[in-house]
């Protein structure tokens, strides 16, 4: 699951679905700031806990630990969980810079050999967090995060991309009509195919 204000309406409707057997679902969140306390309002895990993870009876809920002492080990731990529970569905958004999860243009790699990695957040991404009222100032936005990589997201059987806000219009346009390139990481979604269909 993506954690962003753009997902609020979707998540609020999803938790009321009578057609989903939540007890069969292993839930994951796809990115987390490094250095943010897990119960801080800005924590993506906390965001999802409040909006969905604590509202329905998942089989398991798996969190990235942005406060892990050894971030490489945390990436390995979460990667092993993803391999143990292959992803059926990814629900994601698109950032103003075209990112998916925290795969900003400078760190996006369509052929990444990792499932989870540490990334440096670009200034557009960090400013978006301020504009969306997640942080008061740019300097309060962490400079680094953990994220599922693009290949990890594309392993899903189904992908749902929810982008309701006007401030994302340019990113959506570039995704749909621009070059498929790591300069607009979301553009890779145009090549996504599902074996499950």
Region locations from a protein language model:
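Conserved small/polar residues in nucleotide/adenosyl-binding loops
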Residues: 192-197
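Short beta-strand segments
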Residues: 2-4, 29, 64-65, 91-94, ...
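Glycine-rich anion-binding loop/nest that anchors nucleotide
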Residues: 91-93, 139-174
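Class I SAM-dependent methyltransferase SAM-binding "motif I" and its flanking Rossmann-like core
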Residues: 101-148
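Ligand-binding beta-strand-loop-alpha-helix segment within the catalytic cores
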Residues: 21-91
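Glycine-rich phosphate-binding loop
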Residues: 85-110
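Glycine-rich N-terminal segment of FAD-binding domains in flavoprotein oxidoreductases
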Residues: 1-18
């Amino acid at each position: 699951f993506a954690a962003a204000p753009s997902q609020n309406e979707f998540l609020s409707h999803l938790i009321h679905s009578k057609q989903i057997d939540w007890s069969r679902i292993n839930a994951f969140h796809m990115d987390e700031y490094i250095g943010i306390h897990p119960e801080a309002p800005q924590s993506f895990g906390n965001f999802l806990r409040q909006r969905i993870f604590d509202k329905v009876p998942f089989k398991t809920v798996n969190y990235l630990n942005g406060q892990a002492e050894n971030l490489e080990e945390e990436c390995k731990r979460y990667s092993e969980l993803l391999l143990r529970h292959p992803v059926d569905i990814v629900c994601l958004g698109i950032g103003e810079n075209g990112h998916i999860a925290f795969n900003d243009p400078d760190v996006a790699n369509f052929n990444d050999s990792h499932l989870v990695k540490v990334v440096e957040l670009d200034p557009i991404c960090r400013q978006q967090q301020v504009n969306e009222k997640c942080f008061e100032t740019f300097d309060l936005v962490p400079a680094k995060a953990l994220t599922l990589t693009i290949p990890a997201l594309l392993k899903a059987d189904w992908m749902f991309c929810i982008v309701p806000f006007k401030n994302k219009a340019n990113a959506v346009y570039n995704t749909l009509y621009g070059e498929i390139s790591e300069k607009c990481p979301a553009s890779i979604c145009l090549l996504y195919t599902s074996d499950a269909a």
